[in-house]
């Protein structure tokens, strides 16, 4: 199985450190990049339009962030997705237990799951093995 690249889009710097260390410790992915909001991640995606190998395979996307939240990011991703030659899958990560967020996540075709914070090693193993 080829290891995949993963991006984490979340405004919590402590969570970013924890998930980064966990991913590195268990060696589940070939590379990890972190972004503090959807706008910065979207800009990075746009810069990589001509370089599919540098695009992420998986995005862990937090919903509630400043500048551009997770839902706004998903709307923008939907607009640029046809330009990618690579399939990018998204997992929503949330501390919210709101049913409407879970239901909304099901309306996006490239959202494969909804995970509660904190993301566990088992969650990451499952993601790495199914994508």
Short names for language-model regions:
Residues 65:
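Receiver (REC) domain active-site loop signature in two-component systems and cognate sites
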Residues 117:
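A Lys-centered signature of the CheY-like receiver
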Residues 72, 86-88, 96-113:
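Alpha4 helix (beta4-alpha4-beta5 surface) of REC/receiver domains from two-component response regulators
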Residues 34-47, 70:
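Helix N-cap/capping motif at the beta->alpha junctions
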Residues 59, 113-114:
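Two-component signal transduction core modules
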């Amino acid at each position: 199985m080829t290891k995949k690249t993963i991006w984490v889009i979340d405004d919590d710097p402590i969570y970013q450190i924890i998930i980064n260390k966990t991913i590195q410790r268990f060696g589940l992915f070939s590379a990890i990049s972190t972004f503090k909001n959807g706008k910065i991640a979207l800009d990075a995606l746009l810069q990589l339009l001509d370089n599919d190998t540098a695009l992420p395979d998986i995005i862990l996307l937090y919903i509630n962030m400043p500048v551009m939240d997770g839902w706004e990011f998903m709307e923008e991703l939907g607009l640029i997705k046809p330009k990618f030659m690579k399939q990018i899958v998204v997992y929503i990560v949330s501390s919210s237990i709101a049913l409407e967020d879970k239901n909304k996540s099901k309306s996006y075709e490239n959202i494969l799951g909804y995970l509660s914070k904190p993301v566990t090693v088992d969650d990451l193993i499952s993601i790495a093995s199914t994508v």
